[in-house]
Structure formats: structure tokens, C-alpha cells
């Protein structure tokens, strides 16, 4: 694996690069484990390295979507606006559990607490709804990138927020119209959004949003959307 100098990066974020992500093949079968650092190096991504991830979309009882702006300390895509929470299940027994995507949902609960300070008891795994999976690849810069099969998770609940400033620069709840305005700002270069959020917003998000009371029609645990 290539050696990358991380001396100039945020120390807390560098520590997280040692976490072990779940390596998978293109059909989401586990084939091993590798550090978060090696999973996100473009040099390895170009050789086909692929890992499991998730994206949470949390709506409050007013049907507004919780967005976050990634902190400037983040190694990949700093300062970008994105959906509620995006991260990775780790290669440990609790988060490797594949039955009903329980491991991924446990990981989402863990990261909602770590990033946004949402108490664990407010987002138990059984209240995190697994819709489908999306396979995508995108560069952050010349060194770092993303290559993931992303589990799409939806939550509908009012929650308590206490964000970690090392993870999150800002957050807001948005209506559909407010998100459309934000996407226009991103298209004009006024703000930055993450590539996976752009992809999901342009393809699936508004269909889900229009049908929050009828999400069963979008549940597909067999297909992996290649985007």
C-alpha cells in the first residue's frame, strides 16, 4: 500500500484513518478488511479497492431533512454540505452482521452519536430503515477519494443534536424547496456538496421525500444501483 504523509492533517481525523473498513466485491460480498486510509487513497481505488458504507437521511416530524456541513478538519471533502450522516461499518462482529443489514444500522447509530451527538437511545437500529444500495466512485482531490457500496438508511424522528465540531462545521433542517435552492448554489459553485449527495439528490431523494409514508415501494435489498 502507498505511503502518504499525514503530518499536515488534523490529528483526530488521522487517528480515524486506522479504523478497519469492510472490503467487498462488486456484489457486496465481504472479501477482507483494510484501513480507512487505504480504502480512501485514489491509488488503491484505481486498482479496484471497494468498501461498504452507508448514508443516513434523517427527517423530522415536519418532514424536513437534516443536512450537515463537513468540518474543515475532514480529510476527504472538507467543508462540503451533505446528507445527515455518511460513514462506514467497521470490520468487527457487531457491524459485520449482514442479516437485515443489522451491522450497517448499528454503525449508523454509532456515527449519528459520534458526529451529531444524537443519543444512542433516540436512534435504535430498529428505527433506522434500510432502503437499498448504491455503488459509486468519486475523487475528493488528487490523493483521496471514495469507492463504496452505500447502504441508504432513512430515519423519521425528532432528535437531540449536539454536534462534534471536529466532524461538523454546521447543520440545518431543509424543506424540499430549500434543498433545491442549495443544489442550485452548488451547481453555480457558491457552495460545495459531496459527490454522493449530489448523485442521490439528482436520482432518488425527492421520490423518497414525496412518499415518506409509503417507503415500502422503494425497499430493494437485491439490486445494487450502479451510478
Swiss-Prot record:
Q: Which GO terms describe its cellular component?
A: peroxisome
The listed location of motif Microbody targeting signal is 225-227
Could you tell me which pathway this protein works in? Isoprenoid biosynthesis; dimethylallyl diphosphate biosynthesis; dimethylallyl diphosphate from isopentenyl diphosphate: step 1/1
Query: Which enzyme class?
Result: isomerase
Residues recorded as binding Mg(2+), renumbered to this chain, are 40, 51, 146, 148
Q: How is the cofactor bound?
A: Binds 1 Mg(2+) ion per subunit.
Q: What is its main location?
A: other
Q: What is its EC number?
A: 5.3.3.2
- PROSITE patterns associated with the record: NUDIX
**Which residues does the entry assign to the active site, renumbered to this chain?**
86, 148
Matching NCBIfam families:
IPP_isom_1
* Name of the protein: Isopentenyl-diphosphate Delta-isomerase 1
Gene symbol here is: IDI1
